[in-house]
């Protein structure tokens, strides 16, 4: 599952022509939308990309996989993503502002759940 998310992030980054720092915040928004288990939250995060019906269904299937695996899998995956995000390599690459925006997104998702 983690590999799938990484592949999707790389595809979105390459396909849309974003610089990695520009794609970082939208990626984490979609990622958290998936983890939320809330279809409306997921669709809200996907909306700026104007996804096709098939693309929405693909993200919904990923969301379903997380739901089937339960809270433990979600928590472990979030720990992994947090470890990667705040590794010395990422901290040296991303600006403090980008990291702050990602933290805000994480906090909102954890507080509000959508």
UniProtKB/Swiss-Prot annotation:
Its main location: secreted. The keyword Secreted applies. InterPro entries: CH2-like, Secretoglobin, Secretoglobin_Domain_sf, Secretoglobin_sf. Expressed in lacrimal gland. The keyword Hydrolase does not apply. Coiled coil: none annotated. It is found in: Secreted. GO terms for cellular component: extracellular space. Keywords: Secreted, Signal. Residues 1-23 form the signal peptide. Pfam families: Feld-I_B (PF09252). PANTHER family: ABPBG26-RELATED, SECRETOGLOBIN FAMILY 2B MEMBER 2. Belongs to the secretoglobin family. This is Secretoglobin family 2B member 2. The gene is Scgb2b2.
């Amino acid at each position: 599952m983690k590999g799938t998310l990484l592949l999707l992030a790389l595809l979105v980054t390459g396909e849309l022509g974003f610089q990695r720092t520009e794609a970082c915040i939208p990626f984490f928004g979609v990622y958290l939308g998936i983890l939320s288990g809330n279809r409306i939250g997921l669709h809200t995060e996907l909306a700026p990309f104007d996804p096709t019906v098939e693309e929405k269904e693909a993200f919904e299937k990923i969301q379903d996989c997380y739901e089937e695996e339960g809270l433990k899998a979600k928590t472990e995956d979030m720990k992994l993503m947090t470890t990667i995000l705040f590794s010395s390599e990422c901290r040296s690459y991303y600006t403090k502002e980008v990291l702050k925006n990602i933290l805000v997104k994480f906090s909102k998702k954890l507080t509000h759940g959508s």
